[in-house]
């Protein structure tokens, strides 16, 4: 890639691709939940946690990817790189707005991720010390800002389709995804990329924190204490932190395996996750389109529909793996690269 093209290309890094693959797998499972209204409680518990990890994990990997782009861009070209990131964010917003009109039951995340990229990418020009400070501040302010917004921005609901209301939803009011809660994971992803994917004290600390953070919300819910555990609250954020930390630790530990036998097993597990991770945006668009065709109007099945579940989860994954194996770059990823001046070859080098 020429210097004029912005970010300089380089070899793909395994851990972000695998994490992105886990995230798209989690999102597929979460969006296929309505196909199994009669699922047992244990399975519902598992699927609830899978649903909870999907969006913060996507934000984490987006931060890693944005940091990779920043590091591979010459300082003189970083202004152009930021422009490319803004264009990419705007395209994600536009694609997300279009997909909300398709009539699926999915709460579309792409517009939220577009806003996240536009806001988060410039912050990655900060030094690591200042980025840690900003991350801590965003974490600390997220819950009170969300609570304040719910109490004081009621006017936004008077015109739910208006631009001011839509922006408020993206930033702070949505019951599903909010900039205030996705940005900490984005910045954390960048910091982890800077630190490196090492099995060190930081990794083991994350492993120790994960179950404790995850337990806060269910403990408060079971204790029926007068504490806010709604989406965007501190307990809810800690719950997501626990899930994301555990996922990250498992992937990094497996990626660091060096013994020949276990390495082959890990490689076999990682390959399909890496494959669908590199095509995550295309697969996201594909599965929402299939859901819109399968259940027009977003009407949930009254009984278990195993065929629908199989089409959306393993079916989408199989399409993604085969495309990656025999073609290469996902079609939406290819179009996004062309539109932002970071063109990728459609066919994967053999």
Segments from the language model and where they lie:
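Alpha-helical transmembrane segments and their immediate juxtamembrane cytosolic regions
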Residues: 1-350
